[in-house]
Amino acid sequence: MSGSPVKRQRMESALDQLKQFTTVVADTGDFNAIDEYKPQDATTNPSLILAAAQMPAYQELVEEALAYGKRLGGSQEEQVTNAVDKLFVLFGAEILKKIPGRVSTEVDARLSFDRDAMVARARRLIELYKEAGVSKDRVLIKLASTWEGIQAGKELEEQHGIHCNMTLLFSFAQAVACAEAGVTLISPFVGRILDWHVANTDQKSYEPLEDPGVKSVTKIYNYYKKFGYKTIVMGASFRNTGEIKALAGCDFLTISPQLLGELLKDTSKLVPMLSAKAAQASPLEKVHLDEKAFRWLHNEDRMAVEKLSDGIRKFAADAVKLERMLTERMFSTENGK
């Protein structure tokens, strides 16, 4: 019998091992899929909410959001906008019942180049959370990492005490600007960087440590730790568990339920690949970026320019689809409501 604890330890899942050196976050709007993985936090985005809003299990939330939009009145457009904001918050509030940490809720990607509009929309979302009995300490507002988005994040953090998660982050320039803005958390993307390299270069597969997305997040993590930035680095957008394992030790990693499931079944040994101590030895030098320098440095990275604009377009398109779906249900005469 004495050998059993050792055996049990050896059979520990990769997910449980990962949790020893990284905060695990669930990347989904489908909160019924969260329970078995016991994540600390959760992240949502317009695409994930759109997918969840079409599932039968969540129709009560959709109905509640529609009723809220109608109750507030105004033009058709205003009613739909209010219903969308309410829907995002309803999903977030339900997710928070299942996790001990924070949920990330995204500001409409169509506002990505309008600093003031992003600030106003973020404050509105926090107000809706407050009405739902959720403190702003449990919410991260997601903003696209454009120059305007990063400055909106700085303003929200400094003037309103609202925590921000800077998303669609593909370039080192974006990461430096976010660090200087003092935002709570960044979401550098991994899988979408890999996608770009597979589509635009001759190399079609990569070992995890050579994966360009993994290398990007590793560089950003090392830079933040070497120069003492408090901003949390949360790797996001994974295509396989190899990428996740190659970033073990990163502050946070946000992972889809499908890949969380694969990690739960995986019993191979996991070792931390990133550490604040090792980061001190990295050869990176400190950089300061004003707006002009940021725009130039970001523009020099073709992959990042293309993936940021592509990401904004995709999230905006899904926001339009969600609005269309809610508009049909709110105002179609066939609905009978």
From Swiss-Prot:
Gene3D superfamilies for the chain: Aldolase class I
InterPro entries tied to this protein: Aldolase_TIM, TAL/FSA, Transaldolase_1, Transaldolase_AS
CC per GO annotation: cytoplasm; nucleus
Keywords annotated in UniProt: Acetylation, Cytoplasm, Nucleus, Pentose shunt, Phosphoprotein, Schiff base, Transferase
Coarse class of the protein's main subcellular location: nucleus
CDD domains referenced in this protein's UniProt entry, alphabetically: Transaldolase_TalAB (cd00957)
Subcellular location(s) of the protein: Nucleus; Cytoplasm
Motif Nuclear localization signal, residue range(s) on this chain: 1-10
GO molecular function per UniProt: identical protein binding; transaldolase activity
Annotated family: Belongs to the transaldolase family. Type 1 subfamily.
Subunit structure: Homodimer. Interacts with KPNA1 and KPNA4.
Role according to the record: Catalyzes the rate-limiting step of the non-oxidative phase in the pentose phosphate pathway. Catalyzes the reversible conversion of sedheptulose-7-phosphate and D-glyceraldehyde 3-phosphate into erythrose-4-phosphate and beta-D-fructose 6-phosphate.
HAMAP family named in the record: Transaldolase_1 (MF_00492)
NCBIfam families assigned to the protein according to its UniProt record, in alphabetical order: PRK12346.1, talAB
Free-text domain note: The first 10 amino acids are essential for nuclear localization.
Name of protein: Transaldolase
Annotated source species: Sus scrofa
Organismal lineage: Eukaryota, Metazoa, Chordata, Craniata, Vertebrata
